Amino acid sequence: VAPLVSAINDLLSRLDRSMSTQKQFLADAAHQLKTPLAGLRMQAELAQREIDAGQQDPKQLKSSLQHIAHSSQRAAHMVNQLLSMARAEDKESGRRQLQEVNLARLARETVRDFVPKAMENRIDLGYEGPDEGQGLHGRLMGQPLLLRELVRNLTDNALQYTPAGGTVTVRLMDDPFGQVVVLQVEDTGPGIPEAERDLVFRPFYRALGTNVDGSGLGLAIVREIVQQHEAEITISDARPRSSLNAGQGIGPGALFTVRFPLEPDPAPEGPSPEALPP
């Protein structure tokens, strides 16, 4: 009886922790959504007062409309990230949707999608890896939608933290001996201190000393997708901290590395027994 009671107590304890975690997540999500929605309401009320008072200053109205557009974009981005988080956590659905994925194509398309944002922020965004028509030594089995989301979130995170004039590189490397494909996203931003490298994968966590406008869910989504694909992710400095000149104001940068296991290519079928000579 004692082992049964102990097992039940352990199960109840884990359920309680899970419910507490979910409640905290919902509270954090509500708080994050409240900020852009409050901005929407404030700017809409300001514009309405301007119109009611007959003081239709075009510059003031334009400023209010710009703030409304920005706040609505933030709210929409948060909702999209929450939906992505839900998809990434749906492990049962994921197992039913595995198919061969061309990760190089996803990486190239992601870089192309982010070029306008990189140019707007004066960041050099580039891709290094297999070109169209070049394959891997093995097959990556996964969910294309989630893997695209992973590459997008890592790239977006790098662009968010890289200052103007910096560089972001999306890199794909094939390891034929280890039967893995390695995806790296490298930037020239401030980097992530070693003590915070596990913390940044928590929902809504922001590195100390940063003031980046984002949902705070991107890396949490990345971790869920990595775990679903039985991959591993690590964070390191892009450049040794000892080699940096403090007076230049250049950070070590962050290097995110994801290793995906590959399945071997199917062996070519041999001739049928009927085709063999006697």
Report the location of each language-model feature:
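Conserved micro-motifs of the catalytic ATP-binding
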Residues: 89-96, 135-142
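Glycine-rich ATP-binding loops of the HATPase_c
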Residues: 230-248
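A conserved beta-strand-to-alpha-helix junction within the catalytic ATP-binding
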Residues: 2, 97-112
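Membrane-proximal HAMP signal-relay module
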Residues: 1-26, 33, 38-56, 87, ...
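Short alpha-helical segment of the dimerization/phosphotransfer core of two-component systems
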Residues: 67-75
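Short conserved segment of the HATPase_c
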Residues: 192-204
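Short helix-loop "hinge" at the ATP-lid/N-box region of the Bergerat-fold HATPase_c
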Residues: 158-159
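Short conserved segments within the C-terminal catalytic ATPase subdomain
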Residues: 81, 117-132
